[in-house]
Curated annotation (Swiss-Prot):
Residue sites binding substrate per the record: T64, D139, E205, K235, D239
Cofactor: how and how many bound: Binds 1 NAD(+) per subunit.
Gene that specifies this protein: SAHH
Protein name (Swiss-Prot/TrEMBL): Adenosylhomocysteinase
GO CC annotation, single: cytosol
């Protein structure tokens, strides 16, 4: 794979699709800044003191216009930054170009192969002879995974000379990861351990990545502290819900131009993401059906007037299928073969294994007809009918559209900045062990408060006697940690 790092005139490393798109990217970044009051408030509050001076931050998170504002907030606070995308289709090339030219090292472009994707992830983590990053901003956990797998392989190699064998797994993507680590062993057999020793911690953006972190914590294999940004209320109850409510129909319409009204739509999963997707489809006039494993979530859907059925009950009746579960094997090839002609199948969970894309690709005689980028018709030979698969089973709102809008991402990314500041500030105190943490309630409330003025809100103030009556401080936090918003 002949990929070469390029350098700007100032000497900054990068690999993007087209650096000449930087001016266009800069114009959209300036528009987004107006819609991201939380991040701009962070610049105003912390910029003068440069709290990240001397810090190296590596980010693996969708390289969009909104992420560009996050990156430039980190650099405005003094950090050096290297960045890659966490999805092969989610990069906005003009955003990547603007950041590469003006602010940070970027390795990302829309339409990467899996080999290119992991090459970009490796470049993002490499800071030269001094080791790796001090901090990681992760989305889905791939940067964290690469370091953990690299350390594991180096230790086995030092102990018994064992070299990772890509043929030891059937997972095509993990074969690439093992090959990457195998090649690094021959050049620098201590690279990932140096990264581990330098790392202060990671802040994780999304549900899937958080699951990975907790799995490592419970198994005792987590190598550094982690802050779970996803479960901040101002992330999961806003980005996951309202962001998806906005970006799901945007992706559907850009990809297919289909009229949603009157269609039967199946939403697999009714967590925060599923709730937002179902609300969007219902508002657009679709007849929405939910599938669920959790009786509480199922009851919530029923209270919203949404039938809860099994996929097998409705697979031949529905027009649109959306997976939102964060689990695997939700829609299988046998389901797809029973669907209506031109039924739309898409995923808004982080990885591509909610839909059985491997089984679809390998099904005998199936024909792939590309309508346009990230919109493919798959025709089955025995029925001569087909389905429309969006973004190859990956995140359709970023593959087929531009993802969540700036305002809701400001809330999520303000949490990221606060988490990174907290990890860096406490790096020598021992406050954070090799465990997963969440941000305290008063910081969650602060993130929300930073976004109220933009929408013209005016908060009512508690009197001291009112605060005493309900046993909360006048300035908050107003809810206990266990409160369910």
């Amino acid at each position: 794979m002949a990929l070469l790092v390029e350098k700007t005139t100032s000497g900054r490393e990068y690999k993007v699709k087209d650096l000449s798109q930087a001016d266009f990217g800069r114009l959209e970044i300036e528009l987004a800044e107006v819609e991201m009051p939380g991040l701009m408030a962070c610049r105003a509050e912390f910029g003068p003191s440069q709290p990240f001076k001397g810090a190296r931050i590596s980010g693996s998170l969708h390289m969009t216009i909104q992420t560009a504002v996050l990156i430039e907030t980190l650099t405005a606070l003094g950090a050096e930054v290297r960045w890659c995308s966490c999805n092969i289709f989610s990069t906005q090339d003009h955003a990547a170009a603007a950041i590469a030219r003006d602010s940070a090292a970027v390795f990302a472009w829309k339409g990467e192969t899996l080999q290119e994707y992991w090459w970009c992830t490796e470049r993002c983590l490499e800071w030269g002879a001094g080791g790796g990053p001090d901090l990681i901003v992760d989305d889905g956990g791939d940067a964290t995974l690469l370091i953990h797998e690299g350390v594991k392989a180096e230790e086995e190699y030092e102990k018994n000379g064992k070299i990772p064998d890509p043929a030891s797994t059937d997972n095509a993507e993990f074969q690439i990861v093992l090959g990457l680590i195998r090649d690094s062993l021959s050049v620098d057999p201590k690279k990932y351990r140096r990264m581990k020793e330098r790392l202060v911690g990671v802040s994780e953006e999304t549900t899937t990545g958080v699951k990975r972190l907790y799995q490592m914590q419970y198994s005792g294999t987590l190598l550094f502290p982690a802050i779970n940004v996803n479960d901040s209320v101002t992330k999961s109850k806003f980005d996951n819900l309202y962001g998806c409510r906005h970006s799901l129909p945007d992706g559907l319409m850009r990809a297919t131009d289909v009229m949603i009204a009157g269609k039967v739509a199946v939403v697999c999963g009714y967590g925060d993401v599923g709730l937002g997707c179902a609300a969007a489809l219902k508002t657009a006039g679709a007849r929405v059906i939910v599938t669920e494993i959790d009786p509480i979530c199922a009851l919530q859907a029923l209270m919203e007037g949404l039938p809860v059925l099994r996929l097998e009950d409705v697979v031949s009746e529905a027009d649109i299928f959306v997976t939102t579960t964060g689990n695997k094997d939700i829609i299988m090839v046998d389901h797809m073969r029973k669907m209506k002609n031109n039924a739309i199948v898409c995923n808004i969970g982080h990885f591509d294994n909610e839909i059985d894309m491997l089984g679809l690709e390998s099904f005998p005689g199936v024909k792939r007809i590309t309508i346009k980028p990230q919109t493919d018709r798959r025709v089955f030979p025995d029925t001569n009918s087909g389905i429309l698969v969006l973004a190859e089973g990956r995140l359709m709102n970023l593959g087929c559209a531009t993802g969540h809008p700036s305002f809701v991402m400001s809330s999520s990314f303000t949490n990221q900045v606060i988490a990174q500041l907290e990890l860096w500030k406490e790096r020598a105190s021992g406050k954070y062990e090799k465990k997963v943490y969440v941000l305290p309630k008063h910081l969650d409330e602060k993130v929300a408060a930073l976004h109220l003025g933009k929408l013209g809100a005016k908060l009512t103030k508690l009197t001291p006697s009112q605060a005493d009556y309900i046993s909360v401080p006048v300035e908050g936090p107003y809810k206990p940690a266990h409160y369910r918003y």
